């Protein structure tokens, strides 16, 4: 008994002595942020007061006392002074290559983003651009971005005659804000080989003058896509690098640390691959190749098609476009447009980009190759086609975690939600439409009932479906605060609320700009929330979106954007 007692005492003393061993020092941070509202967007942490980073990753989050234990002699201590820090925004869908070209093109946007609210202003903006643009001087082509017929006083598209009045010698293309139409002057039509005898291509329309033959200058969908790409200037590497850097700077100024290029054409895809190796990307760029055009590109079968970035670039998969835009009245509906476009019958409901057989071919190709697939669908008929084909193809190529993405889903019907859930489709929605085209959708495109349910984020919350929200830049500017404001308020240009049942809380909207699009991209283990081990991708705002009045969200400023611990944007004083 004594032996046992003695042994027990020795064991106890040994345990106590072991407990006195010095604990290892906590790891040292390179940066510590204190005295701020640090919104982690991680449910287990919520909002904290301090964050430490080391080697480009988050070391710890928590109270100031706990985090300051990671302070060393060389640690940089940043006092947020009550400002707000949250994860860098993850772009759910846009077109970096388009933003790059937009940055060096004529700005044809209407107010509040540009000067063009009538045809005369459009013409003058193009004249000014011709006079000042080195791109026009060198390449002899004029590209203007993002006129919006719904906001022009004339409520029509510019014609070839309107653009010929600017110049009959230089080819001019005015791109519609939807990205799905373009207005061409006569010279641009000639260079594109489009004349009175040119038939409409499959999935596209050449609008005609009153004689029914002569092109008016307005090209829709595939007619536009086939004409525009050959007219884009053949930039030198230095020129395109400059444009690309300008585009990246716009995203960084809006707090984005990951950017998408959706439906990347083969030339641009190869250019991105080449330029990334030169280290020009300050943030992560994930490209999705044009499935219908670039499916034979060797890059889709090479090491860049990867969940990991190389020189801040990777190929995430492919994109397929099944219809057009509702604001341009080319989206494919099951019910007619409220007011059909000029020259169309009252029964006009838009049109598909592909037949069901063609769509089946493309989706099968993506699933066969295990390519993550983004599918552009705006009208409910296009969504029907997508869901029906995806259901059939998934029976042959099942995958529980494919994360096929529905891009826009603007006029998704509630009865389609069951298939969205059953197929594990990830919806990437576009609630900025409520501001830019909400009045137009209600009064001209679809009527009140359909318009109130555009980008139906409320249905997603009700059914517990993760989703993301985006800008579709250059369709709209990649304004993070406009994305947030539109998702929370759903106010139109006229100030009306469109679809109150789909208004998001600021917290849900922020998740749809960070952790949920990170999940969409298969990157939620490294991005989208502020937890230890994830990349130190951060944005600092001057005010807290969780406590600001919803209508004031647009006034919040991005002060600093940080990619893996390195500042890539800081707001001017």
Label each region the model flagged.
Residues 16-19:
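C-terminal motif of bacterial Sec signal peptides marking the signal peptidase cleavage site
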Residues 21-35, 39, 43-301, 307, ...:
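Divalent metal-binding segments
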Residues 564-566, 572:
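Beta-rich accessory regions
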């Amino acid at each position: 008994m004594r032996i046992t007692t003695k042994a027990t005492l020795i064991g106890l003393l040994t345990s106590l002595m072991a407990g006195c061993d010095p604990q290892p020092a906590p790891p040292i941070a390179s940066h510590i942020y204190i005295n701020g509202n640090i919104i982690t967007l991680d449910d287990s942490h919520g909002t904290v007061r301090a964050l430490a980073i080391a080697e480009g990753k988050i070391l710890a989050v928590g109270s100031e006392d706990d985090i300051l234990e990671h302070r060393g002699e060389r640690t940089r201590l940043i006092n947020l002074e009550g400002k707000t820090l949250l994860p860098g925004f993850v772009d759910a869908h846009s077109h970096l290559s388009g933003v790059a070209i937009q940055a060096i093109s004529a700005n044809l946007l209407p107010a509040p983003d540009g000067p063009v609210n009538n045809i005369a202003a459009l013409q003058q903006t193009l004249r000014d651009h011709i006079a000042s643009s080195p791109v026009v001087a060198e390449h002899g082509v004029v590209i203007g971005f993002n006129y919006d017929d719904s906001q022009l006083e004339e409520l029509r598209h510019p014609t070839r005659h309107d653009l010929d009045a600017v110049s009959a010698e230089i080819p001019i293309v005015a791109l519609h804000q939807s990205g799905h139409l373009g207005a061409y002057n006569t010279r641009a039509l000639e260079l594109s080989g489009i004349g009175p005898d040119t038939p409409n291509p499959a999935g596209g329309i050449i609008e005609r003058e009153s004689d029914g033959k002569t092109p008016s200058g307005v090209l829709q969908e595939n007619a536009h896509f086939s004409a525009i790409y050959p007219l884009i200037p053949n930039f030198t590497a230095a020129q395109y690098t400059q444009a690309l850097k300008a585009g990246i700077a716009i995203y960084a100024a809006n707090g984005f640390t990951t950017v998408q290029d959706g439906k990347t054409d083969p030339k641009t895809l190869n250019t991105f691959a080449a330029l990334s190796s030169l280290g020009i990307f300050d943030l992560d760029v994930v490209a999705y190749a044009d499935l219908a055009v670039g499916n034979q590109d060797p890059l889709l079968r090479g090491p860049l098609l990867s969940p990991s970035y190389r020189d801040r670039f990777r190929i995430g998969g492919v994109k397929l476009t099944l219809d057009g835009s509702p604001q341009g009245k080319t989206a494919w509906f099951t019910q007619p447009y409220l007011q059909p476009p000029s020259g169309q019958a009252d029964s006009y409901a838009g049109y598909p980009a592909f037949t069901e057989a063609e769509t089946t071919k493309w989706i099968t190709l993506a699933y066969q190759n295990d390519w993550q697939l983004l599918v552009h669908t705006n009208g409910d008929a296009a969504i029907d086609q997508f869901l029906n084909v995806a259901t059939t193809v998934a029976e042959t190529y099942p995958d529980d975690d494919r994360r096929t993405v529905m891009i826009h889903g603007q006029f998704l019907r509630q009865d389609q939600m069951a298939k969205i859930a059953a197929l594990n489709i990830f919806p990437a929605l576009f609630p900025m439409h409520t501001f830019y085209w909400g009045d137009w959708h209600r009064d001209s495109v679809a009527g009140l009932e359909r318009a109130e349910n555009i980008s139906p984020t409320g249905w997603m919350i009700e059914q517990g479906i993760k989703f993301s929200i985006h800008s579709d830049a250059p369709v709209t500017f990649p304004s993070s605060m406009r994305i947030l404001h539109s998702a929370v308020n759903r106010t139109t240009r006229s100030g009306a609320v469109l679809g109150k049942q789909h208004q998001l809380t600021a917290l849900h909207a922020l998740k749809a700009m960070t952790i949920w699009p990170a999940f969409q991209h298969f990157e939620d283990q490294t991005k989208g929330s502020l937890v230890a081990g994830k990349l130190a991708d951060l944005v600092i705002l001057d005010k807290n979106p969780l406590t600001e009045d919803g209508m004031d969200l647009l006034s919040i400023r991005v002060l600093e954007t940080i990619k893996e611990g390195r500042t890539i944007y800081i707001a001017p004083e």
